[in-house]
Curated annotation (Swiss-Prot):
Entry protein name: Docking protein 2
InterPro entries xref list: Docking_Protein_DOK, Dok1/2/3_PTB, IRS_PTB, PH-like_dom_sf, PH_domain
Gene behind the chain: DOK2
SUPFAM superfamilies noted in UniProt: PH domain-like (SSF50729)
GO MF: transmembrane receptor protein tyrosine kinase adaptor activity
GO cellular component terms listed in the entry, alphabetical order: cytoplasm; plasma membrane
Region called Disordered, residue ranges: 247-292, 362-383
Feature: compositional bias, Basic and acidic residues: 362-381
Domain named PH: residues: 4-114
Subunit: Interacts with phosphorylated RASGAP and EGFR. Interacts with RET and NCK. Interacts (via PH domain) with TEK/TIE2 (tyrosine phosphorylated).
The protein's role, per its UniProt record: DOK proteins are enzymatically inert adaptor or scaffolding proteins. They provide a docking platform for the assembly of multimolecular signaling complexes. DOK2 may modulate the cellular proliferation induced by IL-4, as well as IL-2 and IL-3. May be involved in modulating Bcr-Abl signaling. Attenuates EGF-stimulated MAP kinase activation.
Domain IRS-type PTB: 147-252
């Protein structure tokens, strides 16, 4: 497959010799990239020798190009020519082209060396103006330690590279958010990209750069290996891009914490509630505990006897013993009755009465047989006797009493 020639003509190259600098004329041919070759600028000395293939050939790879700019300050250029700089990672070239063709050469070289600026340069070409080339500060050689962004690599056969049908040389570009692989039959065609967040790991040595892609990548998961002597530069550029992406990531929206209620709300009951029932208290509003309403305090001090009376009532309720019914006695009490209490002529003042914890006991009234016996006496006052063994029957005497041998005597009072 023949390489596509983008532009062809002649250029002057300034070379350093023993006794100073000298311009030499070369036949120049600008080739675009393909699946088997990279974009390059080839310089051959002498037109007749180049036809026979005997002339030495100098190749400048455009994937190593850092900047292309005009060099208007160079006054020692050949007649009817204008100079421009072509800087690569290896050296700085000072070239001279016919004044009318210098802009075309610069634009053609930039289109192949910097595919990302193809739209910008095409717009300038459509307007008919010459592109104004300025020094690229990002790739400037004056900035020490600045890693490159595009690198020429050759794919090593692996399982995943065979599945993706990748063979030969390509351009590996370190983008802002993904690692990109450019190449193919048409120059400037992006084949694959691997976002940084989907790369599991990456590494390098003196002649190899490799990385492991995750299963969320377009190519699928697997290890990719590339032959290159710029493995360390690719590694540094990739580290810098990942760090920049982390720092530039916008912070996510701050979520306000949702307050969790102390008590979950009660679900609405599917059944009707009686109209006279009170609604349940709100779980969030504390229900005040009802307190016992105190009586209205008087404007004056409470008398001490009233305090004693209330205290006595409270003690009476605590110490009171439930009243027990008196049992029927076998013998009636014949003792004298307790003297009656004196009747008071005047009522006692309120609050001065003695506190009575217990009521006065009442005498039992089981005296029916005594009253009956008193009614059976005769007027003479004689005593009746009861003879043992003799059936005694008297009118009015209760029959079947428990004690039959009791003799009543009337004693002196």
């Amino acid at each position: 497959m023949e390489d596509v020639v983008v532009k062809q003509g002649f250029l002057y190259l300034q070379q350093q010799q023993t006794f100073g600098k000298k311009w030499r004329r070369f036949g120049a041919a600008l080739y675009g990239g393909s699946g088997c070759a990279l974009a390059r600028l080839e310089l051959q000395e002498g037109s007749e020798k180049s036809r026979r293939g005997e002339a030495p050939r100098r190749v400048i790879r455009l994937n190593d190009c850092l900047r292309v700019s005009e060099a208007s300050g160079e006054a020692s250029s050949p007649r009817d020519t204008s100079t421009f700089f072509l800087e690569t990672t290896e050296r700085l070239y000072l070239l001279a082209a016919p004044t009318a063709e210098r802009g075309d050469w610069i634009q053609a070289i930039c289109l192949l060396a910097f595919p990302g600026r193809r739209k910008e340069l095409s717009g300038l070409e459509g307007k008919g103006g010459r592109p104004r080339m300025e020094e690229n500060e990002l790739y400037s050689s004056t900035t020490a330690g600045t890693p490159q962004k595009e690198f020429a690599v050759t794919v090593r056969p692996t399982e995943v590279s065979e599945r993706c049908r990748l063979r030969g040389s390509y351009t590996l570009r370190v983008g802002e958010s993904a690692l990109e692989l450019w190449g193919g039959p048409e120059s400037g065609t992006q084949l694959y990209e691997w976002p940084y967040r989907f790369l599991r790991r990456f590494g390098r040595d003196k002649v190899t750069f490799s990385f492991e892609a995750g299963r969320r990548c377009v190519s699928g998961e697997g290890n990719f290996e590339f032959e290159t002597r710029q493995g360390n530069e690719i590694f540094l550029a990739l580290e810098e891009a990942i760090s920049a992406q982390k720092n530039a990531a916008p912070p996510g929206p701050q979520t306000q914490p949702v307050p969790v209620p102390a008590v979950l709300p009660r679900p609405e009951s599917p059944y009707a509630r009686p109209h006279d029932s009170l609604p349940p208290p709100s779980p969030t509003v504390p229900v005040p505990t009802p307190r016992q309403q105190r009586g209205l305090e008087g404007e004056y001090a409470v008398p001490f006897d009233a305090v004693a009376r209330s205290l006595g009532k409270s003690l009476r309720g605590v110490l009171a013993v439930p009243p027990q019914l008196p049992a029927d006695p076998l013998y009636d009490s014949i003792e004298d009755h307790p003297p009656p209490r004196p009747d008071h002529i005047y009522d006692e003042p309120e609050g001065m009465a003695a506190l009575a914890l217990y009521d006065s006991p009442q005498e039992p009234r089981g005296e029916a047989w005594r009253r009956q016996a008193t009614a059976d006496r005769d007027s003479s006052g004689l005593k009746h006797g009861y003879i043992v063994g003799q059936d005694f029957a008297a009118s009015g005497w209760p029959q079947g009493t428990e004690y039959d041998n009791v003799v009543l005597k009337k004693g002196p009072k």
